[in-house]
Amino acid sequence: MDFEILKTDEHTKARAGKITTRHGVIETPIFMPVGTVGSVKGVHQRELKDDINADIILGNTYHLYLRPQTPILEKAGGLHKFINWNRNILTDSGGYQVYSLAANRKIKEEGVKFKSHIDGSFHVFSPEKVMEIERSIGADIMMAFDECTPYPCEYGYAKRSMHLTHRWLDRCIAHLEKVPPKYGYHQSLFPIVQGSVYKDLRTQSVEYIASKNADGNAIGGLSVGEPVEQMYEITELVCDILPKDKPRYLMGVGTPVNILENIALGVDMMDCVMPTRNARNGMLFTAKGIINIKNKKWEDDFSPIDSDGHTYVDTYYTKAYLRHLFAANEFLGKQIASIHNLGFYLWLVREARRQIVAGTFLTWKTKMVADMSNRL
């Protein structure tokens, strides 16, 4: 993997760059649609490529391990071929999913024992096991196995968890050397900075992570309930210490406003289920503000969904029609809204990149943050 910074903003810490892998170029800053089980909910791969123009999507190790399972993925030739996607893929290690299974998992030094949400069977994820699964999946970027702590989190637990994540990272790195890639191309391992909201722990963790000289680095354990200003504070602290010549990935973030604020702090990559999850509930993000398409006010509004939008659905369908689809509980409505929201998120990061290159990012961001917060 190669990463090149093409321009840094003079007034913020924002960067415009590009990541190059076997599966193509990823222009940064980038937002990555989440395709947990090998699909972005409600969106065809062709729409992701041609309309939304996603350079990279996510898959999830936990979910893909349970279904369709790694033997099927290996027979298919990896996840790229299984889902017919010839662009980049990043896989989460499953650490966050294990965190979310709090009542059905047990964490020990050797790994995590958890109960499948599908059939109740028990499984063990160790750093070594996760690396083997991620080799079978074949993502271009794969995450190290970590423990994601909740918020709030007691200091002592956060410290013990951070050190456990570091030890697990060392085991991930050691095991990867023994398990070569299965599909003929390099896979980059990104370690994950942890430490909850404690600045001293985050500093320890980021220094440890930076010392590994990985292809890129991730910031985990945020956007789990902490105040947004605390998220920004920790993100800035970590970005200031992480190597400048490696991409920085903030995991699980966030709203369109969060996206721009974190770009300004030096983040290059982000992902979140919000654009598709909120779309399925009738919330549309636009440059002028947020639309709840279920509201009665849109019942006879025959204007385009978003006259400034950048996907075909934005001007092809009207607000009144989309509201009707939601009222009738037609799945097409959720699909249209999902395409719109993802298209908006991808436009937002592309435009942020253009503004960074032009030297006008801060002025543009300030206006966008205000406008996008409106309720229409």
Language-model features: where?
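Structural signal for hydrophobic packing residues in well-ordered secondary-structure cores
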Residues: 138, 169, 173-176, 180, ...
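Non-catalytic, usually N-terminal nucleic-acid engagement modules in DNA/RNA processing proteins
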Residues: 1-182, 296-299
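Glycine-rich phosphate/ribose-binding loops and adjacent secondary-structure elements
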Residues: 175, 179, 184-305
